């Protein structure tokens, strides 16, 4: 290997990295016929699914605050804690059947459901054959666009959802004066009324359920034509002989916070909607568009990625590109493969920016988008992986603004979680949250006494979430946020679990959880019992171990004295064990999994998204535990649901196996047919739908975000060493680079320690690098098989060039 000299200079101009990313766009040569073919738009609160039909353009509308339900009852489950000692008694007698049965007494009500706001239909009154159809979603500008010819006239529609101005806009034009003739209709699947007046449609309604106990909404659609005539009748606006037209959509709901009744204490949704409609007069369409693009690009443009060194012209429709990507008979050229892989990465960033900008209301299972009255799994917040996975790319992919809704949501959970801790578990200090939640910040176990404990009774959701918030601090280095928001949430969760731990009946010096479950998985005991409830589950202890270790670091960061009681309990936690097959045991005993390929790999949380598995291996100078994690992944296999596939990309990357991580990434990008399509060539498995939505199946957005995070993890990994007097951040560049990505460049990727990195690599070696620090920080940076220690100063820029 040629010797490389590292030329380092602070604020020096040595080698600037400017990633030349090609235009990022999804495009199609036909309208959408299914939800999974539609184009998603969102401003973080309002969402639209654009089908782009020529005779009837269906646009499903969503508002991320439009849910069933009302605030949780603080007395829900009061007295259920009495069953916990009985369950423990059964478990310690190895009577797992009785424990499973008793778990049903510690279940509460189901969570609320996320529901669609309404449907806007634009009906073309012109007739005649259509040709030259084109439909596009431009990720670089967050604009959707369709165009077609009819009777020799060129028609175009442009759509966007602006966060800055809180509206959705549609602009319709033709290249011939007076050619636009259409109906505009607004309807909903939930109870509603629509009124047409002058050039405006106003719809009021509420989610399913009692009118006096539901979230209400007011949606206003304004039609502003140039030329032509508008007639309002019933629930329809009719426009004839217009030159062009602009449609504005605004909405407000009565949702006023997790602890506010949506009717008795609801927001003034009608007044708020009317005020939003008035705002549409403040700017022209082009001005709204310019404001939208500028605000969006301030965040989106932070990260640019170029994989490979060959240009691609994007001359294949995205659905065909996706089909051929995994085809053995008509494989894509290398440049096309790299383009799709980059497009999927940026699509994940686009989605998170589009669905997570509302205070205290994070992205749900659907992100923001659903056409279904009752979405799969209620469209809720599933906290045993899915909600957490939604936010994996937020920091590394340089979109920290999107994580603020999650922080506010967890604050709400900490309030309701105190009641759950007391009523369901008999613990009066601290808080916890279970498996499913909603905007009302439900924290209690669900199931209503009849669902399987494997998912309904798990209570580690809050702990996993606060671990994610601590990780956000490591990226942001915002000590005020840590002190005022994140640390109090961590402390409350820690207090609960310090009391939840019990003495291991087999080894009195150890602490375990009881009852315990491993999310959605089932075991088979050595006596043949097929069950779900156990004690000392590995996933439980992994999350608690991560929490206590993070608490140690947080206290040190804030200058607080060590918590000796917590530290003692951390050291007493039942350790990881390795099974007879060399895998990491998921259960206290070396039991068989009912499904060895199960989608959840919860006992690997300490590897990713957690950090402690590698830390333990380093401290003990024993890699056995990492080898066991690897063997577990081998046993699991490479094919699973969409979100699980996204998780496995990151797990393999964390193990440093870039080629295997890439293989899983390829699986994630395998074509999946829309759910409503059942032709002979239909394909239904985990992967990606024609519009690049993640296929569980059905659609769940978490896999999109897991995939985007996985790309980041293959390119850059970071961790913190808190053992020294001052934290040292370890940065590893190209730690899991696939062979097929031997050349590339990225701009704007973030690391723990508050660093922003631009780099270029050739033949798997970094050739130019720029590091910008958000705060004073000590780093140990590893690349090209060498390590360098640096002290960076806030605002400083270090540029490094490899010199022969």
Show which residues each predicted segment covers.
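Bacterial Sec-dependent N-terminal signal peptides
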Residues: 1-21
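Aromatic-residue-lined binding/catalytic grooves and analogous aromatic/hydrophobic interfacial grooves
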Residues: 20-454, 460, 471-473, 491-494, ...
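Short, surface-exposed recognition loops and adjoining beta-strand edges that mediate ligand/DNA contacts
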Residues: 27, 362-380, 497-520, 587, ...
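Charged/polar positions within long, soluble alpha-helices
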Residues: 301, 353-356, 499-502, 506, ...
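Non-catalytic carbohydrate-binding regions of carbohydrate-active enzymes
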Residues: 470-476, 481, 485, 493-503, ...
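Loop/turn elements at helix/coil->beta-strand transitions in domains of secreted/extracellular proteins
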Residues: 478, 487, 508-510
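Acidic/histidine-rich catalytic neighborhood
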Residues: 495-554
């Amino acid at each position: 290997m040629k010797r490389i000299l590292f030329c380092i200079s602070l604020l020096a101009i040595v080698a600037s990295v400017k990633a030349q990313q090609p235009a990022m766009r999804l495009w199609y040569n036909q309208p959408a016929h299914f939800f999974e073919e539609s184009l998603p738009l969102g401003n973080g609160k309002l969402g639209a699914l654009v089908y782009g039909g020529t005779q009837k353009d269906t646009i499903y509308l969503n508002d991320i605050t439009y849910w069933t339900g009302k605030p949780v009852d603080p007395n829900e489950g009061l007295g259920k804690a009495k069953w916990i000692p009985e369950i423990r008694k059964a478990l310690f007698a190895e009577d797992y059947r009785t424990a499973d049965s008793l778990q049903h007494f510690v279940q509460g009500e189901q969570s609320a459901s996320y529901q669609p706001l309404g449907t806007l239909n634009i009906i073309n009154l012109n007739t005649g054959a259509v040709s030259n159809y084109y439909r596009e979603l431009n990720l670089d500008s967050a604009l959707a666009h369709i165009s077609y010819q009819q009777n020799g006239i060129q028609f175009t529609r442009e759509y966007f959802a602006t966060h800055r101005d809180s509206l959705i806009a549609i602009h319709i034009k033709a290249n011939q004066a007076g050619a636009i003739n259409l109906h505009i209709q607004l309807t909903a699947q939930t109870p509603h009324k629509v009124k047409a007046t002058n050039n405006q449609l106003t719809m009021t309604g509420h989610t399913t359920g009692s009118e006096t106990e539901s979230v209400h909404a007011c949606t206003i659609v304004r039609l502003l034509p140039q030329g032509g005539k508008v007639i309002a009748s019933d629930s329809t606006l009719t426009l004839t002989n217009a030159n062009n037209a602009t449609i504005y959509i605004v909405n407000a709901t009565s949702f006023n916070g997790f602890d506010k009744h949506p009717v008795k204490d609801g927001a003034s949704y009608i007044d708020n909607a009317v005020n939003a409609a008035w705002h549409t007069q403040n700017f022209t369409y082009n001005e709204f568009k310019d404001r939208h693009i500028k605000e969006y690009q301030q965040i989106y443009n932070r990260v640019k990625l170029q994989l490979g060194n060959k240009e691609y012209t994007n001359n294949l429709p995205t659905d065909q590109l996706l089909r051929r990507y995994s085809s053995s008979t008509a494989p894509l050229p290398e440049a096309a493969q790299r383009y799709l892989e980059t497009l999927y990465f940026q699509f994940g960033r686009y989605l998170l920016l589009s669905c997570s900008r509302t205070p205290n209301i994070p992205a749900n299972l659907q992100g923001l988008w659903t056409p279904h009255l009752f979405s799969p799994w209620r469209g809720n917040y599933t906290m045993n992986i899915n909600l957490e996975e939604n936010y994996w790319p937020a920091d590394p992919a340089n979109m920290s603004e999107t994580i603020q809704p999650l922080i506010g949501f967890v604050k709400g959970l900490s309030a309701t979680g105190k009641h759950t801790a007391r009523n369901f578990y008999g613990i009066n200090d601290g808080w916890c949250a279970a498996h499913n939640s909603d905007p009302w910040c439900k924290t209690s176990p669900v199931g209503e006494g009849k669902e399987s404990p494997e998912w309904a009774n798990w209570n580690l959701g809050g702990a996993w979430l606060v671990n994610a918030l601590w990780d956000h601090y490591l990226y942001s280095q915002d000590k005020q946020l840590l002190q005022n928001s994140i640390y109090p949430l961590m402390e409350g969760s820690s207090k609960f679990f310090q009391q939840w731990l019990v003495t291991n009946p087999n080894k009195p010096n150890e602490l375990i959880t009881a009852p315990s479950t491993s999310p959605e998985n089932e075991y088979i005991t050595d006596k043949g019992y097929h069950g779900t409830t156990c004690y000392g589950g590995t996933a439980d202890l992994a999350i608690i171990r991560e929490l206590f270790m993070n608490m140690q670091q947080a206290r040190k960061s804030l200058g607080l004295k060590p918590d000796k009681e917590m530290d003692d309990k951390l050291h007493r936690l039942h350790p990881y064990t390795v099974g007879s097959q060399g895998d990491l045991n998921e259960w206290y005993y070396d039991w068989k999994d009912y499904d060895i390929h199960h989608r959840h790999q919860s006992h690997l949380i300490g590897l990713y998204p957690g950090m402690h598995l590698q830390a333990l291996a380093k401290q003990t100078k024993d890699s056995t535990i990492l080898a066991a994690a690897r063997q577990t992944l081998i046993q699991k296999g490479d094919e699973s649901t969409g979100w699980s596939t996204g998780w496995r990309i990151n797990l393999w990357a964390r193990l440093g196996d870039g080629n295997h991580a890439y293989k899983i990434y390829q699986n994630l990008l395998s074509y999946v047919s829309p759910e409503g399509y059942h032709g002979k060539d239909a394909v239904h498995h985990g992967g990606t739908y024609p519009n690049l939505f993640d296929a569980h199946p059905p659609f769940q957005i978490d896999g999109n975000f897991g995939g985007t995070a996985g790309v980041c993890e293959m390119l850059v990994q970071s961790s913190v060493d808190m053992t020294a007097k001052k934290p040292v951040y370890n940065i590893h560049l190209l730690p899991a680079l696939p062979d097929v990505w031997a050349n590339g460049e990225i701009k704007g990727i973030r690391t723990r320690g508050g660093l922003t990195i631009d780099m270029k690599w050739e033949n798997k070696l970094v050739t130019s690098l720029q590091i910008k620090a958000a705060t004073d920080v000590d780093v140990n940076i590893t690349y090209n098989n060498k390590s360098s220690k640096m002290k960076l100063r806030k605002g400083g820029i270090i540029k490094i060039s490899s010199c022969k």
